[in-house]
Amino acid sequence: MLKVGILGYGYWGPNITRNFVQLDDCRVKMVADSRQERLNQLKDVHPSIKTSTEVNDVFEDPEIDAIAVVTPVSTHYGFAKRALLSGKHVLVEKPITTNTSEAEELIAIAREKKLTLMVDHTFLYTGSVEKMKEIVDSGQIGNIKYLDGTRINLGLFQQDVNVLWDLASHDISVVNYLIEERPKTIQATGICHTDNDIENIAYLTLKYVSGLIVHLNCSWSSPVKIRQILVGGDKKMIVFNDIEPTEKVKVYDRGYTVIPDDEKKKVLIDYRLGDVTIPKIHLTEALNG
């Protein structure tokens, strides 16, 4: 029986707590949050779980095997490091930290102590992304030439990380899951429209040795909500639209063929407009994965 302590019961904490409670081989022993009113709400739903307004109570409990860090991003590094140094496994909400050096340090500590350090990249456990991976690995869409991701909405503006750290981490985790290659070059640009110097609109471009290009568009300033990833293969293409209630993944038998014309010294394009296939996916909560 794995005994878990949870730090934070704000926006995501209730979801993490509920899913841990539903696991047969797991017991949530304690939840800590600095706001007593949030802990009172927890007690209304899970009266048997111990609560505390002091995070030290979670770290110092010898019966707790693992700690879930579900707190503001600026606190991830400190809490995760302390948990690892206390000999406890760690699940941390994305993004893992506010910078690369802190993330690398946490990884090194976990390896040294032979502990599990896991980031809550929830999308990797959705039926939609699992189906995309299955299609890509089958060779159905051919060689991937490009991925184009859009993750925009009005808010929520964060106070401790910019829009790339907040939103692009979802898409980057999906990209790394779909393809084994890692980028050769990374370029990012963004702009801040508030007074805190935190970018609210940003664009990220990843280029690979194979010629693959990935472009991600993230924004907290859009009047509409879009959550879409387009995977372009040289045979077929996939569109993942997370806003769709049921038909989230569509495979397009569309594309083009380049026909060289040496005599006219130009390139001719032959377009293919085939069918659209909607594969069956399992629409279950990702945290149950």
Question: For the regions a protein language model found, what residue spans apply to each?
Answer:
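Conserved SAM-binding strand-loop segment of SAM-dependent methyltransferases
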Residues: 48-55
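Basic phosphate/pyrophosphate-binding loop/patch that engages nucleotide-derived ligands
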Residues: 108-116, 130-144, 236
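C-terminal glycine/acidic-rich active-site capping loop/insertion
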Residues: 122, 235-289
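Residues that mark the start of a beta-strand
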Residues: 3, 143-146
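N-terminal Rossmann-like dinucleotide-binding module
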Residues: 1-46
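Beta-strand-loop-alpha-helix segment that lines the small-molecule cofactor/substrate pocket
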Residues: 66-124
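Rossmann-like dinucleotide-binding domain that binds NAD(P)(H)
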Residues: 154-224, 230, 244
